[in-house]
């Protein structure tokens, strides 16, 4: 069984609607209840900032600081992490009218937020993700890349470096600057990064599909079949170096077409995640709203189990309004699955009774307009 990581103290300053708030926890699950708009999701967003990226809302830093705050926001967490007891601090400060993120680990400044993954992995499911299967391919790519990032912390850096190189190429092409050697250098970089991204996605999906096949519980949460489409689909099993050569040559041959289009038309940024309901053999987007929600929960739980298997440590789960659309049986099954994972889960809802079956497996916290009480 995976070892547990858990937060035992959380402190927020000038974060969203929290002027100053502190919460002491004991390692059990955490249920946050309160009226809509009281700050439940804001607190979970703060926890999500203990991982690389822009948090569960993908927020701009300047929007996160409390209105009227003198400077930026700060988040402090003490936790039992993957490397033992650790104190994490992150927040923002304004430099030249621009909000910049800062990070400290055990009081020492750290340059890269990727170092957070040495101490914990954080996964989340929010109501904003309910339209994942019917929404845009860019939303599914973002979802997929967060799944990859949880087991391959370098994936985010590769993705940002690829985007940077692609923007440089697009700029040269849009300006009509067809400098062969310059473009060739950029395209070589894009090929190496793009294929590495694609292979990391495929490997994560292979591992996840194998786990779903082994662990699926169709009576509770339906099984999902996963497939990638839109980039190098026809080259499965080809060596990475050959894939890089193929993509690099394709980029070189499509300069005129890409210049006319004003963007790069082929690459990992064009991939799409295709999901099918296994038991019904139906595309996820054609399933009912309830079936889509159950599919998504099943995917998140399977991925959490994969992270625990790959790292040896259970991730922290953030499940926003998770119980609202589940019947009593599925709620109980969900809570049991979370227990089996062995980690700490934060859950929100307006009615504490929805979580009654958790009993003493959870701490119940009341949230009232940015104020917390146990």
Curated annotation (Swiss-Prot):
Pfam families according to UniProt: SMC_N
Example GO molecular function: ATP binding
Keywords: ATP-binding, Cytoplasm, DNA damage, DNA repair, DNA replication, DNA-binding, Nucleotide-binding, SOS response
Keyword match Nucleotide-binding: yes
Annotated organism of origin: Allorhizobium ampelinum (strain ATCC BAA-846 / DSM 112012 / S4)
Stated role: The RecF protein is involved in DNA metabolism; it is required for DNA replication and normal SOS inducibility. RecF binds preferentially to single-stranded, linear DNA. It also seems to bind ATP.
Broad class of where this protein is predominantly found: cytoplasm
Binding positions (ATP): 34-41
UniProt entry tagged with the keyword Repressor: no
Protein name (record): DNA replication and repair protein RecF
Disulfide bond sites: none
Biological process according to GO: DNA replication; DNA synthesis involved in DNA repair; double-strand break repair; SOS response
A single cellular component GO annotation: cytoplasm
Family designation: Belongs to the RecF family.
Protein localization: Cytoplasm
